[in-house]
Amino acid sequence: MNGNQTKILLIDNYSRGFPTDRIARIETIIKESIAQVEFKSVHFTHFKPKMVEDYSGIILSGSELNVSSFYYDEKLKKKFNEQLELVRNNNQIPILALCFGFHLVAYAFGAQISRMRILGLGGRIIFIKVKKTDELITQKNIPVNVHHMDFVSPNDCNIQKNFEILSTSRTIGYNMVQYMKHRKRSIFALQFHPETHNAYYFHPSLIDERIANKTRKVGQEIIENFLWFCSYNKQ
């Protein structure tokens, strides 16, 4: 890697062999971005905090796993201790946390991670309102792709203490944080998936093609804005 180049580390939190195109989607967005950054993907089982020293930004991916399982599955929690350590101790390198990554960030700062009593949100698109635009999100009303069972309440005192809550939603009866950023550090955490699935994923009879296309465009812009933020932050 070029020492002067902006470098992004993508941590893949999906179990090996799990069928998903989300990591490939993130990689494609990074490769095609005019921000022209270099990147490396590392599976969470191989991640060590010392790896981030040469990087300008870190992306924590989603997963089919649930952080709420940490409360009774110590073995699972142990697999992510390195990422929890990174989130707690990193003061310099910007972090973009997506869905499961969002929950890792919240958990690292002492928030309660709750699980829906139903089967969760299986890849639907919802519209959310953002209180104010910022470095990543430039519109106040956007469609986003959600696919999760865990959620974080906007009333959580540790979230309110450490994060600026920029978007919440009431989805299938649950109040949840959709977007937050750390009050002092460059940590951006999204409950939703900006790495929206490829065009073939959304069934045309269930989701309007125009909304699906806008969701992909908005998500891609969010990731690209993070890349630009990392580039400027490096300078």
What is each PLM-predicted segment?
Residues 111-114:
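Post-Walker A helix-loop "phosphate-sensing" segment adjacent to the P-loop in P-loop NTPases
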